[in-house]
Design a protein with these regions (language model features):
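Basic, polar low-complexity surface loops/patches
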Residues: 1-298, 303-305, 311-329
């Protein structure tokens, strides 16, 4: 039985609420909380049972025939989320907003979050030592605007990229950007290349009205960069229901003060992973990374793939290292924090 053939008046009250919710999230798998399980129905059940190797069953919902259904235990959510995201799906998490034991009638449920490739934050799923950016790109026909956000740290960056597709692709690959937000008019051939060759998830969105928390643009004056950054922030807030209260001021990246390394150079020099096994362990990053925190590890990686060529910045880093070498008590205190 297909969902499009079902009339709301014919189904049970619970299924009626499910169908109303599902109609707002077409093209997204809906995990619908029922007791200790997240249930999927109709086409979502068919897809999930196949992709996750779940048993497909049926449910009586007031109709003459049973509707397709499958489910997962709520405590195993992250395991199944990771598998679906890796396969390129978006998942809407619909939770019970009331205690079923104390509620009379239908329990109120709401979609509290939509999870996609660029919005995974659970330590059980993401590698906290690596970037996990979601980005937006605008094509100005002479230059690209690129903005990218890390939901774990709340950091947001924006920059211009020269009008060269290979340079743009290299930067996206080097930054390990998982998901890209673009407008419908964006170059479809370039998007296909990113999706098929580099497993980048593509989402379409058009709202680039300046983000409501305009104070995040305190250091940004360029209208093109503000609009492009607003595109990804509005998408996260409005479409994916993400809480961005921890988002920091947007940082402008001046690409002219960094040595430009393309993806092939980083790959062949084994700067962040080995050629043969794609492992971090025996790469340059793996040998150098003695950091104590995941944030420190991500910072070190950014230094390796984008070496500074600014003399003042290089000397400042050297001075900081020398200070820690000279003041071992300070170093010990910092380590213990």
């Amino acid at each position: 039985m297909e969902r499009k053939n079902v009339k709301l008046s014919e189904v049970s009250p619970m299924m009626r609420e499910y169908l109303k919710t599902k109609s707002e999230y077409e093209g997204i798998l809906l995990f619908y909380r029922l007791g200790d399980f997240y249930e999927m129905f109709f086409e979502d059940a068919l897809i999930a049972s196949h992709e996750l190797e779940l048993t497909l069953t049926g449910k009586q919902a007031g109709l003459s025939e049973r509707i397709p259904m499958c489910g997962i235990p709520h405590h195993a959510l992250n395991v199944y989320l990771e598998k679906l995201i890796e396969k390129g799906f978006k998942v809407a998490i619909c939770e019970q907003m009331e205690d079923p034991k104390t509620t009379k009638g239908i329990v109120k449920r709401e979609v509290i979050q939509i999870v996609s490739a660029g919005t995974l934050t659970s330590p059980e799923i993401v590698n906290e030592k690596d970037f996990n950016y979601i980005a937006s790109i605008t094509d100005h026909k002479y230059i690209y605007s690129l903005s990218y956000a890390d939901l774990l740290s709340g950091k947001v960056f924006t920059t211009y990229v020269s009008y060269d597709e290979e340079k743009l692709i290299s930067l996206i690959v080097n930054l390990n950007i998982k998901e890209i937000i673009v407008k419908e008019s964006f170059n479809i051939k370039l998007l296909h290349k990113l999706k098929s060759n580099y497993n980048v998830y593509i989402s379409y969105y058009d709202n680039d009205i300046e983000y409501k928390q305009s104070n995040v643009f305190k250091n940004i004056n360029e209208e093109n960069l503000i609009k492009n950054t607003s595109l990804v922030l509005n998408y996260l807030t409005n479409s994916l229901k993400q809480n961005l209260s921890h988002i920091q001021e947007v940082e402008l990246i001046d690409s002219s003060i960094f040595l430009e390394l393309d993806k092939e150079c980083i790959k062949n020099l084994e700067l962040v992973e080995t050629l043969r096994n794609k492992e971090r362990q025996n790469s340059l990053l793996g040998f150098m990374d003695k950091t104590k925190t995941a944030m420190g590890s991500r910072l070190l990686k950014s230094y390796i793939i984008s070496p500074s060529i600014d003399k003042e910045e290089i000397e400042s880093r050297h001075n900081l290292v020398q200070k820690l070498i000279d003041e071992f008590l300070l170093k010990s205190e910092l380590k213990s924090l």
